[in-house]
Amino acid sequence: MKRIWFAVVALSAVLLFGGNQTSHAQQGMIDLSQWTPPDIGVVGDDPFGKLVKYGHELFTNTANEIGPAVADVSKRLAGNNLACQNCHLHAGTQPYAMPLTGVWGQFPQYRAREGMVEILEERINGCMERSVNGRALALQSREMRAFSSYLRWLSTGVPDGAKLLGAGTLQDQGAGTAG
């Protein structure tokens, strides 16, 4: 009888505690392929909304806004005609295509390439200098505030530090290569 009682108690503990570990892990996971990004069309015209809209414009039309042929020489911050969304598809919302949904809550983070912990604005400048062959943005510039406001807005509803299924690329996920 003691063996049966022990087995019932042990099985109950495994089901109670072991099952919760799985559900807790799943609760912290967000599948970006099932995620609906916020709608840029409903962003307000308050100061934050204006920065979000400008950030979206910078992100989707980088060369037209800050590229090498912009009429205002002081705005020539990017050194080529790429747009941010050439790498981060669909304005940074496409799963498995280096999406930026939820990235706001992933920083600061350790960056192996730089060998240090970076804030989001430093990572943005990494893209500015390497990917678009441009100049680093001043941390308090309108452009930097717009980029970071856009990324903050894009992360609306994603808990800080959430595990994001679909972040990175297909190759990063071990699911093959991006096609």
What are these regions (language model features)?
Residues 2-66, 109-178:
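Post-cleavage N-terminal segment of exported redox proteins
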Residues 55, 81-92, 147, 179:
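The canonical Cys-X-X-Cys-His
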Residues 62-65, 80, 91, 97-102:
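Helix-coil boundary and N-terminal low-complexity module in membrane systems
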Residues 69-81:
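Local sequence-structure signature of Cys/Sec-based thiol-disulfide redox active-site neighborhoods
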Residues 69-70, 94-101, 159-163:
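Short, solvent-exposed loop/turn and secondary-structure capping segments
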Residues 74-75, 100-109:
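Short cysteine/histidine-rich metal-coordination sites, predominantly Zn2+-binding motifs
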